[in-house]
Amino acid sequence: PEGLEVVFGRLRTTIIGIRYGAPFNLPLKVDNELELISRRLSTKQAKYITFEVMMPTSFNGTFGDITFPTSSLIFSSLVDKWNAGDMTDVLDKDLIRTVADKVRLERWEGHTKRVFYGRDRGLTGFVGKFTFNISKLAEEENQLLTVLALFGQHCGIGRLSSQGLGQVRVTLQNK
């Protein structure tokens, strides 16, 4: 929506154009899902997944927002977004959560950050780099989580991702 005024805290700006790129230069069409999966399955199994959270995000918790990522929170969020989309197959969230619970956080560097999206409304979220060790997973589990992680570059993670929060860059490492 060109000409729309956007306010983040004290920053006030006007949208003059929108550019969008799909992960891995995939074409923006229905075949993205199958292309993403086939590209991932044809490569070597990853040992680490790094999520670089570029825009603050948090997760819904029972007693308020959760401002630190766990593998279970990240992948549950991604499954919800996958299943909400126009995907041909719905993924089992409980199964994904069980697989994600086997993954451990190897290293992290991040901090909380407050973002205001209205005069008196804001979100305290987190930003930073979070590397998860997935080397102990079975091949099928590894492939499932890496496809979901790469999908996260398209949809974001956590709360308010449709408003631009929770944008991530994902890096897969074999060493």
Can you name each region flagged by the protein language model?
Residues P1-K175:
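RNA-interacting cores
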